[in-house]
Every structure is written in C-alpha cells, then in structure tokens.
C-alpha cells in the first residue's frame, strides 16, 4: 500500500521475516537485481521500527551515484508515512549539495530555532533541518541515505564518533550491495555491526549474490 502496488513474493517474505523476529537482529535479503529489494527493505524497516521502537532509518549504499538515485524513492516513502509528524531527511555524502532534489528541499530548510509549528512548514513534513546539515550531525536526522562509509566510520576511533553512534542507535540500518564490499571494508563493517548489536539496532543486509 505504501508503494502503490501489491508486494511480490520476495517483498512478502521480507515483511513476514520482520514480523517474526523475536528481537532486534540482522535480516539478510538475498535476491537478484530487479525484484524490488529496496521496497522490501523499506517495508521490513517500517515493521521493525514499529516493533522495536526505532525512530528512523539509515540506508547505506556503495557509491554517491546509487545514493543519489535512491534519494527520491526514499523521500517519497518518508512522505507517505501514515502520521503527520514532522521529520528530517539527510543525503549524507560529500557531493550531496549538488543533488537537485536535495537542493530543492534545502530551499524549504527549517531553521534551527523553528519548533516545526509554522503553518507554512506543514505542507512539507519531510524537510532538511538546518541543524542536521553539518557533517558531524548528519546521522542524527530521522531519515538518512548516503554512502556506506558513513556507517563504517562508526567503527573508527575518531573525534565526535559518539554522534555517529547516537544517530545510528535509534534507527533501522539498511546496507545495500553488501556483496560488493572488499575484505578491507568488511573488517570495518563487522566492527560497526558489533556496535549496532550492542545497541539492539535492527539491521537489514541486501545482497544480489
């Protein structure tokens, strides 16, 4: 219903798996390209968020181009959520400021001092909030789509890393194309998943092989 079409077998299986998980954990969805893994992941994420109290999602992709391509679909999904609560969205990669759809949203940016009660802001309930535009606060927005390195950096010992952990701790984390990552990236992914496990964060891994 959220996407305007009935779920196929893969999407139905993902939703059933999300509904039957006893506790936050890792849901692995392996299927060939073109079967609707993205919609399956978002539908499962919505179920997991409702069941385990998450307040948003992080969608990690391997490249800036794939993140840009998926951004309009994620925005549409976010805008079709059933309640009218205001939410923030963030495109998190180094060239985000060149994305036309993201630039359009920035023209409707919510100032830091705004309490979201401005009638003029009610038409667009998913917005780019000014406070989340900084690189350190990027993962604190409700809906974050970006390159997977935004997640991998949570495995590093670096300044302000606790803000990444804080942003991820309240979300459902989706990692796409995980079959394409090399051994070097997988070491950081393993460590990041270990942290997410301690935080009881539901994780969805998407793979084509």
Regions found by a protein language model. Give the residues of each.
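N-terminal helicase ATP-binding lobe
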Residues: 1-209
């Amino acid at each position: 219903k959220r996407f305007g079409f009935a779920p196929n077998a893969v999407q139905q299986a993902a939703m059933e798996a999300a509904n039957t998980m006893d506790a936050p954990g890792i849901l692995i969805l392996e299927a060939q390209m073109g079967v609707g893994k993205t919609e399956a992941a978002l539908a499962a994420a919505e179920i997991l968020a409702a069941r385990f109290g998450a307040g948003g999602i992080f969608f990690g992709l391997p490249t800036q181009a794939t993140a840009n391509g998926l951004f309009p679909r994620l925005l549409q999904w976010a805008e079709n959520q059933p309640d009218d609560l205001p939410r923030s969205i963030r495109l998190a990669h180094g060239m985000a400021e060149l994305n036309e759809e993201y630039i359009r949203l920035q023209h409707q940016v919510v100032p830091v001092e705004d309490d979201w009660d401005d009638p003029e802001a009610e038409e667009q309930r998913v917005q780019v909030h000014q406070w989340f535009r900084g690189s350190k606060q990027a993962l604190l927005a409700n809906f974050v789509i970006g390159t997977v390195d935004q997640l991998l950096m949570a495995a590093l010992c670096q300044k302000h890393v606790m803000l990444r952990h804080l942003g991820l701790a309240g979300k459902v984390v989706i990692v796409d194309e995980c079959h394409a990552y090399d051994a070097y990236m997988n070491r950081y992914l393993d460590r990041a998943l270990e942290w997410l496990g301690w935080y009881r964060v539901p994780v969805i891994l998407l793979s084509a092989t």
